[in-house]
């Protein structure tokens, strides 16, 4: 069996920053540090931070007074921010800056009283945070659509003042179809100047297409609740290549690889490289040859840390 590795794969700049914020907060202030929602959607990462003293909660009413709280990379609603401020909690915001960009777009449309359509997956924390940026008291409204059927059923009050934004971790191909449907139904709709789907999502989807084209099977390292990891698995399957989403080597079954000559491996943006290495090691034990890394797009984007952690960690 040959092993081919997608490039790029794994951690993006927003995930790197979010994990580092939790680690530095633990270093500087000591445990416990409370984190609202999993800081990133990866079991291995969350378990490691939990062992260091991070406490993960879903709502702020689970957080005692006078503690440090970190908002996850997925972002939070304005209501959550106001609740934290009202309680006087010390907050470090690990929201990915590319998610914050979408939040700012929604706030602007809300302030102008313009209606906004968010393309995204209902129930995902990023979507909940983005929807929660919109203040309908200025006369507008925000609508969530997931697919073309949702667009067909959508009714708005002022199509001449309508905008759309997207969740940052969607399938580019699926999102393009939804945008086309929105433009067909609402010709005056306006989108962001730059695509909201983040650079890392785009790069990893491009890389998995190349990988699936060269392999008999694709393994996507990522947790089941990771949106971008699920999109990678779906994309490989759409290209006709069997694909599995796995948290790590322990999820693999030997029988999957019967008759497989070329195995492709990629990782979602929240999955660390150590998990990929564990998968490779297991495959090598099962007789796979040395891995080959495909050529890909170089990523050199970094995001700065919150000032207080940046100074105190020196």
Curated annotation (Swiss-Prot):
(2E)-4-hydroxy-3-methylbut-2-enyl diphosphate binds at residues 41, 74, 124, 168, 226-228, 270. The active site is at residue 126. The keyword Oxidoreductase applies. It catalyses: isopentenyl diphosphate + 2 oxidized [2Fe-2S]-[ferredoxin] + H2O = (2E)-4-hydroxy-3-methylbut-2-enyl diphosphate + 2 reduced [2Fe-2S]-[ferredoxin] + 2 H(+); dimethylallyl diphosphate + 2 oxidized [2Fe-2S]-[ferredoxin] + H2O = (2E)-4-hydroxy-3-methylbut-2-enyl diphosphate + 2 reduced [2Fe-2S]-[ferredoxin] + 2 H(+). Binds 1 [4Fe-4S] cluster per subunit. This is 4-hydroxy-3-methylbut-2-enyl diphosphate reductase. The keyword Iron applies. CDD domains: lytB_ispH. The gene is ispH. It comes from the Bacteria. Its cofactor is [4Fe-4S] cluster. Gene3D superfamilies: 3.40.50.11270, 4-hydroxy-3-methylbut-2-enyl diphosphate reductase, catalytic domain (3.40.1010.20). Pathway: Isoprenoid biosynthesis; dimethylallyl diphosphate biosynthesis; dimethylallyl diphosphate from (2E)-4-hydroxy-3-methylbutenyl diphosphate: step 1/1; Isoprenoid biosynthesis; isopentenyl diphosphate biosynthesis via DXP pathway; isopentenyl diphosphate from 1-deoxy-D-xylulose 5-phosphate: step 6/6. Pfam families: LYTB. Isopentenyl diphosphate binds at residues 41, 74, 124, 226-228, 270. InterPro entries: LytB/IspH. One of its GO terms (biological process) is terpenoid biosynthetic process. It is an enzyme of class 1 (oxidoreductase). Its EC number is 1.17.7.4. Keywords: 4Fe-4S, Iron, Iron-sulfur, Isoprene biosynthesis, Metal-binding, Oxidoreductase. Catalyzes the conversion of 1-hydroxy-2-methyl-2-(E)-butenyl 4-diphosphate (HMBPP) into a mixture of isopentenyl diphosphate (IPP) and dimethylallyl diphosphate (DMAPP). Acts in the terminal step of the DOXP/MEP pathway for isoprenoid precursor biosynthesis. [4Fe-4S] cluster binds at residues 12, 96, 198. One of its GO terms (molecular function) is 4-hydroxy-3-methylbut-2-enyl diphosphate reductase activity. Dimethylallyl diphosphate binds at residues 41, 74, 124, 226-228, 270. NCBIfam families: ispH_lytB (TIGR00216), PRK01045.1-2 (NF002188), PRK01045.1-4 (NF002190). Belongs to the IspH family.
């Amino acid at each position: 069996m040959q092993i081919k590795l997608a490039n790029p794969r794994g951690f993006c700049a927003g995930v790197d920053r979010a994990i580092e914020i939790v680690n530095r907060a633990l270093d500087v202030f000591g445990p416990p540090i409370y984190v609202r929602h999993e800081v990133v959607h990866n079991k291995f990462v969350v378990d490691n931070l939990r062992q260091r003293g991070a406490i993960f909660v879903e709502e702020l009413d689970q957080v005692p007074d006078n503690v440090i709280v970190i908002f996850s990379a997925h972002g939070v609603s304005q209501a959550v921010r106001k609740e934290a401020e009202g309680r006087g909690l010390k907050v470090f915001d690990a929201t990915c800056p590319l998610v914050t960009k979408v939040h700012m777009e929604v706030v602007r449309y809300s302030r102008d009283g313009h209606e906004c359509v968010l393309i995204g997956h209902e129930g995902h924390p990023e979507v909940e945070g983005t929807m929660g940026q919109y203040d309908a008291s200025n006369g507008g409204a925000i609508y969530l659509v997931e697919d073309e059927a949702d667009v067909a059923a959508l009714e708005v009050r002022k199509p001449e003042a309508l905008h759309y934004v997207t969740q940052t971790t969607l399938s580019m191909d699926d999102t393009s179809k939804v945008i086309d449907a929105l433009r067909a139904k609402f010709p005056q709709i306006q989108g962001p100047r730059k695509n909201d789907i983040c650079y890392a999502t785009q790069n990893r989807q491009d890389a998995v297409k190349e990988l699936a084209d060269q392999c008999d099977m694709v393994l996507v390292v990522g947790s089941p609740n990771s949106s971008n990891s699920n999109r990678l698995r779906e994309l490989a399957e759409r290209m006709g290549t069997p694909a599995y989403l796995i948290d790590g080597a322990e999820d693999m079954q030997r029988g999957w690889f019967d008759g497989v000559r070329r195995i492709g491996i990629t990782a979602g943006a929240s999955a660390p490289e150590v998990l990929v290495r564990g998968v490779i090691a297991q495959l090598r034990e099962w007789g796979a040859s040395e891995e080959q890394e495909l050529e890909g797009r170089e990523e050199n984007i970094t995001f700065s840390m919150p000032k207080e952690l940046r100074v105190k960690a020196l």
